[in-house]
């Protein structure tokens, strides 16, 4: 067996099928991706309610915003990132829409002062929080917290429905390619492949298709069937427990601060400098621990500063307590020697 931590999910199958996330969510619509979900939600609002302007937080996955550019709606950024306590400066008028983000499952903008704007909350990093806030709508990607190749969702209001979205051939083919990548990664971790080159090639080719509007589709039916086998609540609960365990193992240091204490997404470190972040990241990769940076390619200076200091370390349900302790110990050992 090859021991690697982080990066993309390998294929996982479960017969438990006990998720309340799907069974107890009225008006939940499944899409190929999170960006397809928000695209179709905005499209619905434009045609049905006359939405004119939408605001996205400046610190965000900008590929999602670009996917929505062709819609007949003005798109703006409002200043906000999860380490800045920015007040929301927004034109609170009828016909305006504000997208808020539950960042890493730990922080989101306070929109209590907004009385007229429609609020849409992105719960990608905290799937089980859907419906818990006063937002008008919820959407997200499923593939950040769950081992599934494609998937997004949108929760509408009662009696609202999408009428013109279907499954596309490109969405189906991309799902199949992503599945091949996940199967190949499983083989790689079992030491049945000489290298990770093949599965990485399939992953990268599939990921490129997410930017293509030909994947503006409902969730492929095969993906829905796979999703229904996953014990979603169990996965996220285990991830929370692992992250809490990892945090308890970390020794205090002035080199970084932990941004999250209770979430089901990942361990989020905010490093003192970009140099510390980059050096720690390289050290972890050298030890087969592959952290993520959320999100690259920021536009505004404050957001670039955060992008350059943040590190997201996976301690999810894939890993045992012993493996989580190993990851935390590696972080500790790095700072012992600097």
Predicted segments with their positions:
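Conserved glycine-rich beta-strand-loop-beta hairpin in the small C-terminal domain of fold type I
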Residues: 214-247, 256-270
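PLP-dependent enzyme catalytic core of the Aspartate aminotransferase-like
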Residues: 286, 298-338
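N-terminal "arm"/small-domain region of PLP-dependent enzymes with the aminotransferase-like
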Residues: 1-23, 193, 197-217
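Active-site phosphate-binding strand-loop segment of PLP-dependent enzymes
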Residues: 80-164, 173
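Conserved PLP-binding active-site segment in aminotransferase class I/II-type PLP enzymes
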Residues: 1-50, 92-93, 226, 231-237, ...
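Conserved PLP-binding catalytic core of the aspartate aminotransferase-like
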Residues: 254-301
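Conserved PLP-anchoring active-site segment centered on the Schiff-base-forming lysine
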Residues: 43-92
């Amino acid at each position: 067996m090859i021991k690697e931590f982080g990066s993309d999910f390998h294929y996982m199958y479960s017969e438990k099928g006990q998720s309340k996330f799907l069974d107890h969510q009225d008006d939940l619509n499944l899409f190929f991706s999170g960006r397809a979900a928000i695209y179709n939600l905005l499209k619905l609002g434009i045609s049905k309610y006359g939405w004119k302007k939408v605001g996205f937080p400046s610190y965000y996955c900008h590929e999602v915003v670009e996917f929505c550019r062709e819609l007949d709606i003005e798109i703006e950024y409002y200043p906000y990132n999860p380490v800045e306590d920015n007040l929301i400066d927004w034109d609170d008028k009828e016909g305006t829409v504000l997208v808020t983000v539950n960042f890493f499952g730990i922080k989101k903008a306070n929109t209590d002062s907004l009385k007229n704007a429609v609020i849409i909350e992105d719960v990608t990093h905290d799937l089980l929080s859907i419906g818990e806030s006063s937002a008008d709508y919820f959407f997200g990607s499923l593939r950040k917290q769950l081992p599934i190749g494609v998937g997004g969702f949108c929760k509408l209001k009662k009696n609202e429905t999408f009428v013109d979205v279907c499954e596309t051939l490109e969405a189906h083919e991309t799902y199949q390619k992503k599945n091949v990548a996940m199967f190949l990664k499983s083989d790689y971790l079992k030491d049945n492949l000489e290298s990770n080159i093949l599965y990485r090639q399939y992953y990268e080719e599939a990921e490129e298709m997410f930017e293509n509007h030909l994947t503006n589709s409902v969730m492929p039916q095969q993906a829905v069937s796979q999703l229904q086998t996953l014990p979603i609540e169990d996965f996220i609960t285990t991830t929370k427990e692992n992250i809490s365990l990892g945090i308890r193992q970390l020794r205090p240091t002035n080199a970084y601060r932990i941004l999250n204490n209770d979430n089901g997404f990942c361990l989020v470190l905010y490093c003192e400098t970009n140099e510390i972040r980059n050096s720690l990241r390289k050290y972890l990769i050298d030890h087969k621990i592959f952290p993520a940076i959320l999100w690259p390619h920021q536009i505004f200076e404050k957001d670039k500063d955060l992008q350059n200091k943040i590190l997201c370390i996976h301690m999810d349900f894939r890993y045992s307590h012993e493996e989580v302790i190993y990851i935390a110990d590696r972080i500790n050992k790095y700072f012992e020697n600097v």
